[in-house]
Amino acid sequence: MASKRILKELKDLQKDPPTSCSAGPVAEDMFHWQATLMGPSDSPYAGGVFLVTIHFPPDYPFKPPKVALKTKVFHPNINSNGSICLDILKEQWSPALTISKVLLSICSLLTDPNPDDPLVPEIAHMYKTDRAKYESTARSWTQKYAMG
């Protein structure tokens, strides 16, 4: 079941890729993908290229994929291990969701962080109390880690 569904999503992605994202399997392993996200132009991550790893569980799509950011990013909902705090990757997952929708959700999280459900409380606090400092730090991290 899982491999058929993953194959279908891959075909759909190749036919109609989401804006500013690309994804596909690593080598021959259909359960392990790598994706690339372009930093949204209306965010401090603009110009950055962010690598994402995707691991599909054997019971996909009934369980969410494990998705992690490989590129270091300064963000209240993404920690230094690349874990992403996004409801659809946890309790809000639904088999109707696709990798394409997940990637678009990560892009919108880059544009609109959720400081009320942070993975990194210090960054969330800065986002709420000193937006200019947050944006300049996020920009400098993007230049340092995502534009190499």
From Swiss-Prot:
Reaction it catalyzes: S-ubiquitinyl-[E1 ubiquitin-activating enzyme]-L-cysteine + [E2 ubiquitin-conjugating enzyme]-L-cysteine = [E1 ubiquitin-activating enzyme]-L-cysteine + S-ubiquitinyl-[E2 ubiquitin-conjugating enzyme]-L-cysteine
One biological process term in Gene Ontology: ubiquitin-dependent protein catabolic process
EC number: 2.3.2.23
Keywords attached to this entry: ATP-binding, Nucleotide-binding, Transferase, Ubl conjugation pathway
CDD domains: UBCc_UBE2D
Source taxon at top rank: Eukaryota
Residue positions of the active site: 85 (glycyl thioester intermediate)
GO cellular component: nucleus
Induction: By N-acetylchitooligosaccharide elicitor.
Gene3D superfamilies: Ubiquitin Conjugating Enzyme (3.10.110.10)
UBC core domain mapped to chain residues: 1-147
An annotated Gene Ontology molecular function: ubiquitin-protein transferase activity
Entry's family note: Belongs to the ubiquitin-conjugating enzyme family.
Role, per record: E2 conjugating enzyme that associates with the E3 ubiquitin-protein ligase EL5 to mediate ubiquitination of target proteins.
Name of protein: Ubiquitin-conjugating enzyme E2 5B
Protein species of origin: Oryza sativa subsp. japonica
Gene: UBC5B
